[in-house]
């Protein structure tokens, strides 16, 4: 039995590796925009968990005896969910809106083993620094935040611009180890069953 990560996120992979797990990487290809459109008016936690579940369910049939993990993260600011900015221009615009403010990073998790599944969202409060225009532009040009929910990272250059967080740090990076541990326990498994070091 292995852990299968239904994601190509380097951050999610890093979290698992640092926690002693070498997962099988099997990115799921789902139409996120179509799923979000179907969920118009839904609560933010439901949106991120449904995206995570779609990813896990897309590949779970190919891994019937393995633990499959799907995840999705979005930033909630002023009642609006924000995913990845994709461009330096969008990153700069978002940072000008969020600097000096507080927002919530919501990570949806779907952990499946055969027909069993645990679906849960974790929410962490982010206190953004009042970053200068020069730093915002340099950060955007670095390319680092372009593929990150909320246009920031906690574990790399973005760490300069986060004053504090309240909640689970691993969830902010992309995958809550406490959520995964609870799911494993509910399946009668232990986290240490998957350690490779």
Curated annotation (Swiss-Prot):
Main location: cytoplasm
Gene3D superfamilies referenced in this protein's UniProt entry, alphabetically: 3.90.950.10
A GO molecular function held by the record: nucleoside triphosphate diphosphatase activity
Cofactor(s) needed: a divalent metal cation
EC identifiers of the protein: 3.6.1.9
Gene Ontology CC terms: cytoplasm
UniProtKB keywords: Cytoplasm, Hydrolase, Nucleotide metabolism
Job of this protein: Nucleoside triphosphate pyrophosphatase. May have a dual role in cell division arrest and in preventing the incorporation of modified nucleotides into cellular nucleic acids.
The protein, known as: Nucleoside triphosphate pyrophosphatase
Native source species: Corynebacterium efficiens (strain DSM 44549 / YS-314 / AJ 12310 / JCM 11189 / NBRC 100395)
Organism ancestry: Bacteria, Bacillati, Actinomycetota, Actinomycetes, Mycobacteriales
